[in-house]
Amino acid sequence: EIMKMPGHHKLFVVGELGRHYFVSQGHEIEQNFQYTVQKPNLSRARIISETLMEQFNNGELDEVYVVYTRMENSMVSEVETVKLLPLERSAFGEDSIPANLRREAIQLYPSVESVMDNIVPNYVTGMIYGCLVEAYASEHNARMTAMKSATDSAEAIIKDLSIAYNRAR
């Protein structure tokens, strides 16, 4: 859906399967992070986020979205799209703060810009790491479900063959 929106798009892909898919669909890939989904870690998330933050801060990217597979439950995985940059207040659930809660002004030292320059990269890294972990859990769950289904089918076939064998004796 995002790729169909008007404008110029840059595609950053994590993993070989995603790269194959987008290349086969005729999409040009800006950068392919050749990491396996099997071992998501914070250092990989940091490398990805630094690349995206650098291009966003240089004005090469207007918006940054992450599309990944989120595990809804043990049977269902959903495609999830999250807007990472620019940050929006609505993403932080300010509406969920109770109205009767006392609010005070927050003073940030040495400046708001300095604090945000430290917080935003960590937030983006954390979100990307969370997406990598969620995608890994989703893939692992899909494999486990497929293996259970294959095992159940094999057991049913063995049972049927055993009955047929015993009848033939």
Region spans (language model):
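C-terminal beta-strand-loop-alpha-helix "lid" module of Rossmann-like NAD(P)-dependent dehydrogenases
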Residues: 1-169
